[in-house]
C-alpha cells in the first residue's frame, strides 16, 4: 500500500489552492509508518517517518534556481529494488567527506582495475588490525552503487571493518544474459562468470586484489578477510569459492545468486552463508533438483564435507542439522560432526531480487564475525573452535 513504501516528496505550488491542498492531504495520509521505514530506510528513518512538511515561498518555475532546488531535493535519495516488500531507500553519500579512497592498479594479466576502500574514521592510522569485507556488485551496477545501497558502511563504523568494493569491467553482454542475444553490440558492467574463455580472469583479479590490499594497507587482518556479493556478485562469490583463491578467505556469504561457473581447485573447508528470495530470479526451493540454486547448494555441501556426490541430493533435501524460521528468514543449517555450521541457507519471505541492508547485518553478526582463519595452517575456527 502507499503507506508501506517510503517516498520522499517535495511539492512546489505558488499558492495553496484546493487542488494543491488535496495533493498535500494525499501524501499526509500516506505518511510512512514506523515499521515500514525501519525495514526500507535504515538510515534517516525518523525523517522519512515524519509528517508531511510544507513551506511557503515564491518560485518562478522558469528559473534555473527552481530546477536546482528540486534536483537538490530529489538527488539526495537513492532507491534500490522494485518490490513493495524488498526495496531500500538511502541517501547519496559524499565520498570525500566520508574518506572513501578510490584505488586503481594493473593486474598481472595487464588489465586495469579499480576498487574503492572505506576505513571508518575512528580506525584510520590507528595501526589496529581490521577485518576486511570484499563486496562484489551485481550485473550492470558498480562499486559505487553497491557501496551506497548496501549500507555496509554503517556496519563498518559500528564494528570496525575495512570495506573493499571492486569494480567489474565493461564487456559485451553474453547471449545468456538479457539483451545479449538481441543486441550483440551491447556492453554492460559484468563479472566474467558467464564466459568460459574469460571467467578465470576475474579469479586472477581477486588474487591480485588481495595482494594489493595487503601491500597497501598494513591494517588488513589476513585471518579475517571475507567475501560477499549480490546477484552476479553472489555468482562471483560461488565461483571464487570453488577456486584456490578461496583459501585466503575466512568465510563467504552472499545474496540472491546461483551457481554460474566453478573450478575444482578449492580444497579447504570454507564456511558459506547463502540467501535467496521468495520472489527471486531463480527458485529458492531446495526440493527442486538441478536448478542453478540447488547446484550452488550441492557444490558447497560437497565442498565442505557435508555430503558427497552420491548422497548430496538427499543431504540437501533432508540432511540439514537444523531448520528454523526467524522473522523473514527461513533457515537451513548443515553442521559438521563437531556441531560447527559450515553451510547455511536462508530464503527470505516477501523479498524480490535485491540486497537488503538487514541481510548484510545478518551476514556480519551471525557469520563473518564468528569465523577466523589461521593463515599458516589454513585451518578456520568458529567462535574459537577449530574446524577439523
Outline where the language-model segments fall.
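Extracytoplasmic/secreted proteins, especially bacterial periplasmic and envelope-associated proteins
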Residues: 22, 26, 65, 69-73, ...
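A domain-start/cap signature at the N-terminus of enzymes
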Residues: 2-132, 158, 198, 228-244, ...
Amino acid at each position: 500500500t502507499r503507506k508501506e513504501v517510503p517516498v520522499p516528496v517535495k511539492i512546489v505550488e505558488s499558492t495553496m489552492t484546493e487542488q494543491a491542498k488535496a495533493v498535500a492531504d494525499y501524501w499526509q495520509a500516506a505518511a510512512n509508518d514506523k515499521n515500514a521505514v525501519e525495514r526500507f530506510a535504515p538510515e534517516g528513518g525518523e525523517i522519512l517517518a515524519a509528517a508531511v512538511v510544507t513551506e511557503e515561498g515564491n518560485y518562478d518555475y522558469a528559473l534555473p534556481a527552481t530546477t536546482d532546488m528540486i534536483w537538490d531535493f530529489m538527488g539526495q535519495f537513492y532507491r534500490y529494488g522494485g518490490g513493495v516488500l524488498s526495496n531500500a531507500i538511502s541517501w547519496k553519500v559524499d565520498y570525500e567527506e566520508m574518506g572513501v579512497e578510490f584505488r586503481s592498479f594493473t593486474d598481472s594479466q595487464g588489465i586495469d582495475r579499480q576498487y574503492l576502500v572505506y576505513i571508518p574514521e575512528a580506525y584510520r592510522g590507528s595501526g589496529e588490525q581490521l577485518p576486511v569485507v570484499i563486496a562484489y556488485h551485481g550485473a550492470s551496477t558498480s562499486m559505487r552503487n553497491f557501496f551506497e545501497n548496501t549500507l555496509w558502511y554503517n556496519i563498518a563504523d559500528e564494528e570496525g571493518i575495512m570495506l573493499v568494493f571492486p569494480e567489474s569491467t565493461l564487456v559485451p553482454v553474453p547471449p545468456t544474459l538479457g539483451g545479449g542475444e538481441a543486441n550483440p553490440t551491447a556492453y554492460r558492467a559484468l563479472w566474467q562468470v558467464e564466459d568460459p574463455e574469460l571467467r578465470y580472469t576475474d579469479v586472477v583479479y581477486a588474487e591480485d586484489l588481495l595482494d594489493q590490499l595487503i601491500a597497501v594497507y598494513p591494517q588488513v587482518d589476513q585471518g579475517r578477510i571475507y567475501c560477499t556479493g549480490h546477484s552476479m556478485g553472489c555468482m562471483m562469490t560461488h565461483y571464487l569459492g570453488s577456486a584456490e583463491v578461496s583459501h585466503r578467505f575466512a568465510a563467504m556469504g552472499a545474496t540472491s545468486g546461483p551457481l554460474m561457473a566453478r573450478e575444482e581447485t578449492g580444497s579447504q573447508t570454507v564456511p558459506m552463508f547463502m540467501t535467496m528470495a521468495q520472489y527471486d530470479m531463480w527458485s529458492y526451493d531446495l526440493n527442486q533438483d538441478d536448478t542453478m540454486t540447488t547446484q550452488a547448494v550441492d557444490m558447497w555441501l560437497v565442498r565442505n564435507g557435508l555430503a558427497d556426490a552420491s548422497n548430496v541430493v538427499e543431504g540437501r533435501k533432508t540432511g540439514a542439522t537444523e531448520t528454523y524460521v526467524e522473522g523473514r528468514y527461513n533457515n537451513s543449517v548443515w553442521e559438521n560432526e563437531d556441531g560447527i555450521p559450515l553451510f547455511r541457507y536462508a530464503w527470505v519471505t516477501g523479498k524480490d531480487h535485491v540486497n537488503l541492508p538487514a541481510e548484510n547485518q545478518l551476514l556480519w553478526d551471525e557469520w563473518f564475525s564468528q569465523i577466523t582463519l589461521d593463515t599458516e595452517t589454513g585451518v578456520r575456527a568458529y567462535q574459537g573452535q577449530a574446524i577439523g
